[in-house]
C-alpha cells in the first residue's frame, strides 16, 4: 500500500519533491511474505545489476598482494561527465581523495590511524572460534551450506590447521593458496547402486591443488531473504566460506572503530540510540543556523549493495597512511569482492506437463526450454563458469561489509561549501540529510549539491523512494520523526503479535512489552496499543488453548480448585482471561493479588507455585554435578522425540528400556507440574534440579549408562 507523504507527515504545502509534486512511502500494514521459490532468478538479478552499473567504466590492473600478482577490475569515472539521473556503480577516485583530505586534517588522521591499528591487532589476535557464530556458511570443500561451526570444522580437518587466532588462520590460508599445504576432504555424492537398483549417498575423498583451493575460497552461495516488509519480490542473500569470513571479520572490526569516531555514522548504535541521536543532531543543525530554513531529506539509496566500490576504501586506507601487513590484509579483504562467484544453494524445480524437472546450477544453460523469455534474458546476461557458478566482479552483494562501506558513504554524503550547512547521518543504505539556507530554495540547492557529490562514492539516492520536507520531519530506521518528536511505528501488527512458541505467558508478555515501548517512544495512542494486545491475546488462544494436553490440564485444575479457577489465568490452565491493559505489566502477579483479595487460597497457592520467582533462591544445579537421567522439558509435550531402535542385540534392548523409563519419568513430572511444558518456565532440568526446586517429592530415577 502507498500513502502520500504530504498527507501523512506534514501536509502537501510544505512538501518539496525532487522529481514529482508528491512522493510516496510504504506503510507496513500487511503480513510479511514468505517466499518458497528458488534463489536462482533473484541471484541473477543482483549479479546483472552489479555488472550493469559499472559496465564500460572499469579498467583491469595487476596488483601485488602478499607477493602474488593479482588482477583487479578497478572502476573510475569523471563525475562532471556523468548523467546524475543514472545509477552508476563506480566512484570518482580523484574526488574521493579530495573529500577525505577535506574531512580529516593531519592530526585527525594520526589519531584515527592509531585507533585502527589497535583494533586491527585486537581482531587479529581473536580466537578463530568467533567464526562459529551464525546460522549458515559455505562449506568450500563440498560447495554446500551448513552451520558455521560445522564449516569451520570441515575446513580445519581438510587443511590441517593447528593454530588458534585469526592471524594464524590467515597465514595458514596463504600457505594453502601457495601450494605448501595439502588440502583434502570428503564429499557426499549420489551414485547408482547396482545391487539395490537405486541411487545411494556415498562418501568420496577429494584432493585440491593450489588453483582449485584458491577458486573455492571466493565462492558464495545464495538463498532467499524471507519475511521482508513491503517486498513483493524475493531478494537473494549470500554466505561465504571460512577464509572469506576471516578477512571480512578483521576488516569490519577495524572499520567499526572508524564508525564510532565518525559523527556522521550511526550504524554501530542500537535502534533506540540510533533514532534519538539522529533526531538530536538534526535539531542541532537548525540551532547552529538560527534564522535559516531547515530542509530534511530522507529515503533510500538505489541498489546500495550492487553499487558499492571497494576501491574507495583502498584510497581511504592510503590517505590515512596505513602501511605494512595491516594494509595488505585489509587490501586483500577488499580485493575478494572482485573475485567472487555465486550460485544458489538448492537446485531449481520446473514443472513440465505432468512431471517435475530438477535443474542443477551447472545445467541451467542446457535446459533453456524450461525457462520463459524474462528468465532466459537473465541467464544469458551473466558470465557463467564451468562448474555452474556465476562470476561477479563488481558490487558488495547483500550485507557483507556494512561497516566498511558505511565509512565510504559518509566521506561524500555531507559535502557543503559552507561549513555545517549540510549534515548527513548514515547507517548502511539508510540515511537522513539536513540542509540549511536563507530560504527553502537556497537549502534545496545546497542539498542537491551534496547529492551530486555523493555520487563520487557510488551513492545513488532514489528519486522515487526519497523525499524532503521543511523542518525536522524524517523517517529513519523504520521510525518516523515529526517536528522533532518520534512517531511510534509498530511496523507490522501481524508480525509483532504472532506467538513465538515460548509459552502463553511469555508470548503475551512480549506483545505487551512491544505495545508499551511503542507508547513510550512516541505518540502511539492507548487505544492502538490495546488493539495490539487484543490481537496478541487472540493469537495465543488459537495456538495454545486448543491443545489436548491443555484441556486435560484445565480439567485437573477444575477438580482441585472448583470455582476458584476464575482467579487462575488462562495461561496456567484457569478461566481468567487476561485484560489487554494487563499485558504490559505482570498480569500473573495481578491475578495472584486478586486471588488473595477474594480469599481464593487454592488458586493463589497454585499461581505462586507456577511462578519462577520463588525458585530463584534455590539456584540452578550444574549439569556436571548431576549424574541422573535428563528430564528434557519441551514446548510441545506431545512430541517426546524419544527414539527407539530395532532390537538386534542385548544392548539395543537395554537402550529401549532406558528410553521408555525416561519417557515415563518425563510424563510423570509434566502431569504433576504442567507448567514445566512451557519453554521458559522449566527450562532444561535434571531430576536433581526438580527436587531442589521442590517441584517433585519422589520420582523414579534412571541412572545414566555409557551405552545410553
Curated annotation (Swiss-Prot):
Keyword Nucleotide-binding assigned: yes
Quaternary data: The RNA polymerase is composed of three subunits: PB1, PB2 and PA.
Catalytic activity: RNA(n) + a ribonucleoside 5'-triphosphate = RNA(n+1) + diphosphate
Gene Ontology MF terms in the entry: nucleotide binding; RNA binding; RNA-directed RNA polymerase activity
Function, as annotated: RNA-dependent RNA polymerase which is responsible for replication and transcription of virus segments. Binds the promoter sequence of the encapsidated viral RNA. Displays an endonuclease activity involved in cap-stealing. Cleaves cellular pre-mRNA to generate primers for viral transcription.
Listed EC numbers: 2.7.7.48
Transmembrane segments: none
Chain ranges of the RdRp catalytic domain: 281-467
Protein name: RNA-directed RNA polymerase catalytic subunit
PROSITE patterns, per the entry: RDRP_SSRNA_NEG_SEG
GO BP terms: viral RNA genome replication
Domain of life: Viruses
